[in-house]
Design a protein with these regions (language model features):
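Long terminal accessory regions outside catalytic cores
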Residues: 1-15
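A polyanion-binding, active-site-adjacent surface
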Residues: 12, 16-19, 24-239
Length: 239
């Protein structure tokens, strides 16, 4: 039989307690009614917004994770949740961890320019990361960490249900496709992955943070961007 918790501030009369049915259990702990309201609000939300909130709660409940324990915030995603284009980066850096947003600072400025170059506004796409928490000292996530978070990432992709996936960086490539090759050998070619019961076109390209460190690679990134623009047109995507 399920036990119920009764919250009382007064001291209990033991004679009364002895007469109470065993299905009741008494506690002096205060009830956090605000937390209950918030949890019920999350559970009651429907559609993509509700599913994302529930996924966020699941990720925030991960135990024994150094990434989660050493980060200030969980970085979930930004942009239009109904966008046909989903952009996946690697992991938050210090600024993104503080602001709980994707692609901030100089990285964000460059990403905006890259998308505008193919006539796409940043706010029209949905962006997230392969890893939702900042790795210590911005190190590369380990293979074990990538595998652990890829479960949540694929659920995230399934919720957004995009028509095109853009993977920026080796971590994103490994998390979504399982490929561990050099990104220079995989970038620029359209592939297909199956998430749930849907096949999604995927292209791998360099992360903007990498392009800031190695600007000579921008010429390859431009070739990838042109292929993305063509795919948008071929699929008659309005964005």
């Amino acid at each position: 039989m399920t036990k119920k918790m009764l919250n009382q501030n007064a001291k209990y009369d033991q004679r009364f307690l002895d007469k109470v049915e065993p299905k009741f259990e008494f506690s002096n702990k205060p009830i956090n009614r605000l937390k209950i309201v918030k949890e019920n609000s999350v559970q009651n939300k429907t559609g993509k917004e509700g599913r994302i909130l529930r996924l966020k709660k699941k990720i925030n409940s991960i135990e024994d994770c150094n990434l989660r324990n050493n980060s200030k915030n969980l970085v979930m995603g930004d942009g239009d949740i109904n966008s046909p284009i989903m952009l996946i980066g690697e992991a938050p850096d210090e600024k993104e961890d503080l602001e709980a947003k994707t692609f901030c600072g100089d990285v964000g400025v460059l990403l905006n320019k890259m998308l505008l170059a193919i006539k796409i506004k940043r706010e029209k796409v949905y962006s997230t990361y392969s890893i939702n928490f900042r790795p210590p000292n911005d190190r590369k996530p380990t293979t074990q960490e990538i595998k652990r978070y890829s479960i949540f990432l694929k659920e995230h992709i399934s919720i957004i249900d995009p028509k095109i996936l853009i993977l920026m960086g080796t971590t994103a490539m490994e998390a979504v496709t399982g490929l561990g090759n050099q990104i220079s050998n995989e970038r620029g070619n359209w592939k297909e992955i199956i998430i749930g019961n849907k096949t999604i076109p995927v292209i791998i390209t360099f992360n903007p943070s990498y392009l800031i460190r190695y600007p000579d690679k921008k010429k390859f990134s431009w070739e990838d961007l042109k292929k993305i623009r063509k795919k948008v047109e071929d699929l008659n995507i309005i964005i």
